[in-house]
């Protein structure tokens, strides 16, 4: 029934049913992956982090959990990068430049984390979507050669 709710995109019903599933079944990677998807759709990010961590302990190559982390770190880095660059371009002062540099200290490690997850995903399944993300990440990390390589793979 839980899987049926997921397939039919009844996220709230799937979420309610989860508590009724036997504890042993709650350690099944397939069910946990489904529950991660439910939490993602319901925008329960803290729950997603906990579930993804639990799934990766059981299956280090689980696509759903790896995608969660890859996207999480990518968008965290990208959104901060864009907002700080926009602020700096609007007001090119020493203080704004210092703020940009401080933000980049957070941005680059998150891009690297995302890169590592996307590289693993790409190795498992060389999707164009993963290659495009890798191209974007390598562009931000100023590695033009690798960015170009992955952009070509994305076409």
Language model: regions and residue ranges:
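TPR alpha-solenoid repeat register
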Residues: 31, 65, 99, 130-131
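Structural register within alpha-helical repeat arrays
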Residues: 1, 34-38, 69, 76, ...
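Short coil/linker segments at helix-helix boundaries
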Residues: 78-117
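Residue at a conserved register position within TPR or TPR-like alpha-solenoid repeats
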Residues: 5, 39, 73, 80, ...
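Conserved structural position within tetratricopeptide repeats
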Residues: 19-23, 53-57, 116, 122-123, ...
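Short coil turns that delineate tetratricopeptide repeat
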Residues: 26-27, 60-61, 125-126
